[in-house]
């Protein structure tokens, strides 16, 4: 079996970096990926793909990328489920990223507060 995904798109918001109780960095990002064709109105639509990044990949992406950054993500599709507060099973499909390539001409560091 083969499960590999390669995407190029722009971050829809700043990476959401957190740490697990074991100290592992994890970040969640959403990529806006343009479709390769135009709709009936002549506009290019985008798909919004949720991605999860771990460890150094998560930390580096949070450090060097922000909303609007152009990135390339390679990884695999993963599905999982959990029970929400109302007791309803929620199913999630996301990309578990192996690598993230920063594709802007120059990485943009976040401004110090």
UniProtKB/Swiss-Prot annotation:
Q: What kind of modification does the protein receive after translation?
A: Phosphorylated by YwqD, which increases ssDNA affinity; dephosphorylated by YwqE.
Asked if the record carries the keyword Membrane, the reply is: no
Main localisation? cytoplasm
GO BP: any one term: establishment of competence for transformation
What inducers act on this gene? Only expressed during growth in minimal medium, strongly induced when cells enter stationary phase with highest levels reached about 2 hours after transition to stationary phase. Expression activated by ComK.
- Please give an example of a GO cellular component term from this record: cytoplasm
Give the SSB domain ranges.
1-104
Name the phenotypic consequences of knocking out this gene: Transformation efficiency drops 10- to 50-fold. Destabilization of DprA.
Q: Which residues form a coiled coil?
A: none
Query: Which PROSITE patterns does the record associate with it?
Result: SSB
Tell me the residues on which Phosphotyrosine occurs. Answer: 82
Entry GO MF terms: enzyme activator activity; single-stranded DNA binding
Keyword annotations for this protein?
Answer: Competence, Cytoplasm, DNA recombination, DNA-binding, Phosphoprotein
Subcellular compartments: Cytoplasm
> Assembly and interactions?
Homotetramer.
- By its UniProt entry, which NCBIfam families does this protein fall under? ssb
Q: What does this protein do?
A: Not essential for replication of the chromosome, but is required for optimal competence. Binds ssDNA, binding is facilitated by DprA, acts as an accessory factor for homologous DNA strand exchange.
Q: What is this protein called?
A: Single-stranded DNA-binding protein B
Lineage, please? Bacteria, Bacillati, Bacillota, Bacilli, Bacillales
This chain is encoded by the gene named ssbB
């Amino acid at each position: 079996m083969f499960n590999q995904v390669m995407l190029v798109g722009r971050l829809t918001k700043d990476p959401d970096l957190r740490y697990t109780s074991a100290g592992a960095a994890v970040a969640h990002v959403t990529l806006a990926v343009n479709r390769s064709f135009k709709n009936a109105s002549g506009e290019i639509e985008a798909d919004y793909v949720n991605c999860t990044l771990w460890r150094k990949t998560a930390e580096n992406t949070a450090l060097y990328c922000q909303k609007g950054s152009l990135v390339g993500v390679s990884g695999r599709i993963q599905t999982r489920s959990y029970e929400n507060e109302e007791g309803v099973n929620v199913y999630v499909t996301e990309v578990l990223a192996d690598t993230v390539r920063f594709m802007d001409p120059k990485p943009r560091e976040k401004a110090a507060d």
